[in-house]
Amino acid sequence: MATGKIVQVIGAVVDVEFPQDAVPRVYDALEVQNGNEKLVLEVQQQLGGGIVRTIAMGSSDGLRRGLDVKDLEHPIEVPVGKATLGRIMNVLGEPVDMKGEIGEEERWAIHRAAPSYEELSNSQELLETGIKVIDLMCPFAKGGKVGLFGGAGVGKTVNMMELIRNIAIEHSGYSVFAGVGERTREGNDFYHEMTDSNVIDKVSLVYGQMNEPPGNRLRVALTGLTMAEKFRDEGRDVLLFVDNIYRYTLAGTEVSALLGRMPSAVGYQPTLAEEMGVLQERITSTKTGSITSVQAVYVPADDLTDPSPATTFAHLDATVVLSRQIASLGIYPAVDPLDSTSRQLDPLVVGQEHYDTARGVQSILQRYQELKDIIAILGMDELSEEDKLVVARARKIQRFLSQPFFVAEVFTGSPGKYVSLKDTIRGFKGIMEGEYDHLPEQAFYMVGSIDEAVEKAKKL
């Protein structure tokens, strides 16, 4: 095992000099004793003359020139397999939940090649989430990739928590949650939410929070992905949740600047598309098992054309766009039914009835959107009878797209609801065909199935 010495420390970037005949490879892990702590560095560049430039995976406070650094001669390796379920780990796969050692049987390197073309498989099977607006407007494919797009505070994390809860309870699958650069408080809430729902023993949690150095936040997504790949290669259908993919890009920007690369548009790293591709190409389904991934994507200043969300769009099968405008109406989940898309919304995949219902709902909401200006200027009375009916139905549909969540019972005060796809289609079809024209629109707000709306109307 070769040993080198630190020659320069600039924040999270540490330069280490090794003997010329024992220079570590790019992505190799190095270890340095920093006081009582062991710090892991990852090689990013070979500068020549035996010097390598590395990124610290933890705080570089207290490092000084001349300290001895060991080359571990392999990339960062993390525990994989069933031993990781129910545990909280950091980027290096070390437990941070005070429950002792992981006791894993196997460790895998976090840098791995994506599956080859022959190994890939294509599935048309739908994954029911129990969330009406998602199942109807932007259905998820088993083994597909989904992005939850939204600005600050419109409900990305809450939606993600609800998805994990529903899928873990209703589908009893394994999940891996990678918290990339999010708030520590959210990670804590998340852990307790999973424990309260009794699904913690089916989830592996990997956290690299906002206060961690950029190298840590850049690699934590790969740590989570490696654990998911192991479950997939055992022949399971696994779910990978990444919250938040934007912070992964942001960490890449910070690392890129520290390594002295020239920034590109809006200050992002020049390797943005490649870094995103390296991660996304590994999140895929093979003939052995599937990885279905749900990724929260923070949209800076609500601008979907920003390079980071725009690069992410290219990799996704379904996009769930959360809208501040809908959230401000008090309709949660604040999914925009006109902006959200899915490759699965195709009559050959979902069936003609589902397709027609979804498109019908969209056209009614679109017409309502167009009529809003007329209503604002001239009032409802100036509309034709036909348009008045469209507006009434659109307002009912809009309210019926809301739903009480299990993980948000504390906020809404009403018990969470899981709605099957069959009930969802039946409800929206009924509203469009005028079966419920006699019910007041308040009856449709924050209910599960259409039968609950009918019951609620009796009490109003």
UniProtKB/Swiss-Prot annotation:
Pfam families: ATP-synt_ab, ATP-synt_ab_N, ATP-synt_VA_C
Cell compartment(s), UniProt: Cell inner membrane
Keywords assigned: ATP synthesis, ATP-binding, Cell inner membrane, Cell membrane, CF(1), Hydrogen ion transport, Ion transport, Membrane, Nucleotide-binding, Translocase, Transport
Top-level EC class as recorded in UniProt: translocase
Residue ranges crossing the lipid bilayer per the database entry: none
An example Gene Ontology CC term for this record: proton-transporting ATP synthase complex
Membrane-protein topology: Peripheral membrane protein
Residue positions binding ATP: G150, G151, A152, G153, V154, G155, K156, T157
InterPro entries: AAA+_ATPase, ATP-synt_VA_C, ATP_synth_F1_bsu, ATPase_a/bsu_AS, ATPase_alpha/beta_chains, ATPase_F1/V1/A1_a/bsu_N, ATPase_F1/V1/A1_a/bsu_N_sf, ATPase_F1/V1/A1_a/bsu_nucl-bd
Source domain of life: Bacteria
E.C. number(s) listed in UniProt: 7.1.2.2
Catalytic activity: ATP + H2O + 4 H(+)(in) = ADP + phosphate + 5 H(+)(out)
GO terms, molecular function: ATP binding; ATP hydrolysis activity; proton-transporting ATP synthase activity, rotational mechanism
NCBIfam families tied to this protein: atpD
HAMAP family recorded: ATP_synth_beta_bact (MF_01347)
Oligomeric and partner information: F-type ATPases have 2 components, CF(1) - the catalytic core - and CF(0) - the membrane proton channel. CF(1) has five subunits: alpha(3), beta(3), gamma(1), delta(1), epsilon(1). CF(0) has three main subunits: a(1), b(2) and c(9-12). The alpha and beta chains form an alternating ring which encloses part of the gamma chain. CF(1) is attached to CF(0) by a central stalk formed by the gamma and epsilon chains, while a peripheral stalk is formed by the delta and b chains.
Family: Belongs to the ATPase alpha/beta chains family.
Function according to Swiss-Prot or TrEMBL: Produces ATP from ADP in the presence of a proton gradient across the membrane. The catalytic sites are hosted primarily by the beta subunits.
Protein name: ATP synthase subunit beta
Annotated source species: Salmonella arizonae (strain ATCC BAA-731 / CDC346-86 / RSK2980)
